[in-house]
């Protein structure tokens, strides 16, 4: 069974349709990713001056950091058409061919989750990216023949959260690789303040700070929290969102000061109380929480590891001193061998 949607999930949710209005429309409006923005601005200006298609661009980074938004901005700044799709949607080579043959000169084709393209589709994409040609096999058996179709010179913008899953031939064909990083609290404050202005709701500096601190370094989460806090402010007939309103709303939503939600705290508390802080294997945790293993590894643990609350050791999951302080619990004395580098992790 699919786990319920979490308020602090960086993945796109069905109720995120409202964040379209919050997205910046130009590079000058885009907050954060300063080096990436500066480089993109130069590459776009150079391509525009030469009247050429921009080199293919690859955005790499965790979900919710603005890869799709930046792809749209690239097309808008170039003044060209924009077509969007995703790796899992392009099931056959013919699906990709249909997309490519409908592109105009210098258009931008955006493929999200590009690491999920099938090998057969990738083979068709290589000559399209390199030579702007489609090399298709028509027919079967002895009657099969190769047909080359010239394409308009286009820009492929790929986005991936899993750069390690990209094949080397595909990765090497992107002339402009750009890595997006988590945002600072100050950058998220700017995003929240701008979002409040777009939504027509008042926002104090400390209110923006309170939302930004709990947004896990991710604009998508910041926008989602902002919309829910706005609901609390409207219900209270407040003129503006201040720290008190933001704290009340986010506490009601069970998002604490570190951005952890009820599931995060349940995970940490289970290890602390039931297993003495660890180490404990992931299969044991899956049984204890009644959650599938992949949900624990892909949804719950990454942020806890990033924040320094959790370690993955060869012997299992282990809480750090930081985690016990956050939970307000005394850290038990643990044998140094629990931090050992040898042996295999219990049912990991």
Curated annotation (Swiss-Prot):
ATP binds at residues 22-23, 64, 67-69, 130-132, 173, 183, 220. Keywords: ATP-binding, Cytoplasm, DNA damage, DNA recombination, DNA repair, DNA-binding, Hydrolase, Nucleotide-binding. Residues 1-183 are annotated as: Large ATPase domain (RuvB-L). It is found in: Cytoplasm. Residues 184-254 are annotated as: Small ATPAse domain (RuvB-S). Residues 257-348 are annotated as: Head domain (RuvB-H). DNA binds at residues 293, 312, 317. GO terms for molecular function: ATP binding; ATP hydrolysis activity; four-way junction DNA binding; four-way junction helicase activity. One of its GO terms (biological process) is DNA repair. Gene3D superfamilies: 1.10.8.60, P-loop containing nucleotide triphosphate hydrolases, Winged helix-like DNA-binding domain superfamily/Winged helix DNA-binding domain. It catalyses: ATP + H2O = ADP + phosphate + H(+). Its EC number is 3.6.4.-. InterPro entries: AAA+_ATPase, AAA_lid_4, DNA_helicase_Holl-junc_RuvB, P-loop_NTPase, RuvB-like_N, RuvB_C, WH-like_DNA-bd_sf, WH_DNA-bd_sf. One of its GO terms (cellular component) is cytoplasm. Residues 1-20 are annotated as: Disordered. The keyword Nucleotide-binding applies. Mg(2+) binds at residue 68. Has 3 domains, the large (RuvB-L) and small ATPase (RuvB-S) domains and the C-terminal head (RuvB-H) domain. The head domain binds DNA, while the ATPase domains jointly bind ATP, ADP or are empty depending on the state of the subunit in the translocation cycle. During a single DNA translocation step the structure of each domain remains the same, but their relative positions change. Belongs to the RuvB family. Homohexamer. Forms an RuvA(8)-RuvB(12)-Holliday junction (HJ) complex. HJ DNA is sandwiched between 2 RuvA tetramers; dsDNA enters through RuvA and exits via RuvB. An RuvB hexamer assembles on each DNA strand where it exits the tetramer. Each RuvB hexamer is contacted by two RuvA subunits (via domain III) on 2 adjacent RuvB subunits; this complex drives branch migration. In the full resolvosome a probable DNA-RuvA(4)-RuvB(12)-RuvC(2) complex forms which resolves the HJ. The RuvA-RuvB-RuvC complex processes Holliday junction (HJ) DNA during genetic recombination and DNA repair, while the RuvA-RuvB complex plays an important role in the rescue of blocked DNA replication forks via replication fork reversal (RFR). RuvA specifically binds to HJ cruciform DNA, conferring on it an open structure. The RuvB hexamer acts as an ATP-dependent pump, pulling dsDNA into and through the RuvAB complex. RuvB forms 2 homohexamers on either side of HJ DNA bound by 1 or 2 RuvA tetramers; 4 subunits per hexamer contact DNA at a time. This is Holliday junction branch migration complex subunit RuvB. It comes from Bradyrhizobium sp. (strain BTAi1 / ATCC BAA-1182). The gene is ruvB.
